[in-house]
Amino acid sequence: MKLKYADENLISRVVKIWLITGLVMVFMQIVIGGITRLTGSGLSITRWEIVTGSIPPLNEAQWQSEFELYQQTPQYHKINQGMSLSEFKFIYFWEYFHRLWARLMGLVFIFPFLWFLWRGMLSRRLVPRLLVVVALAGLEGFFGWIMVASGLIQRPWVNAYNLTLHLTMEIGRAHV
């Protein structure tokens, strides 16, 4: 009987560490998103490729191709015309890091969630909340792309309402 109690404590502690790690990652994503916004980097990646977008440009030809796509955006024409490739790499880094961190958060959340669920390590009360977190994460990524797309058409900036929704969903996810 004592062993079972010890196992329950261990399970509870492991789940708590996982949830706290998720909260810290959400906070870091908000900080990274703020840096991305303040550096004007959010429109530097003009495509939304969930899997292949995980790999940054690896050679000069790929960098030049990404830069040429950016040069077609309103932000480049109205604000950053004449930007060098090295300046582009700086803003690209922040948007790339923002997206990469989001993908990492997804992996850090979904695999342990499925493992804990399969092993019966999550309380019945916690499972619906965590499913809401999964749904919010997917919606947030979708709204993030809508936000970026809003700045690639006519304006050199993103729609403020979309930005607010994107940030609010991130904060809301931390409170579920």
Regions found by a protein language model. Give the residues of each.
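Long, glycine/tryptophan/cysteine-rich extracytoplasmic
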Residues: I45-P74
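Individual transmembrane alpha-helix segments
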Residues: L69-L107
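Non-cytosolic membrane-interface motifs at loop->transmembrane helix junctions
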Residues: R155-H166
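C-terminal ends of transmembrane alpha-helices
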Residues: V31-R37, G138-R155
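N-terminal signal-anchor transmembrane alpha helix
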Residues: V15-S54
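Membrane-interfacial loop-to-transmembrane alpha-helix junctions, especially the N-terminal start
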Residues: V15-I17, R124-A137
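Membrane-interface helix-boundary motifs at transmembrane edges
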Residues: N9, W118-V127
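Conserved small/polar residues in nucleotide/adenosyl-binding loops
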Residues: A174-V176
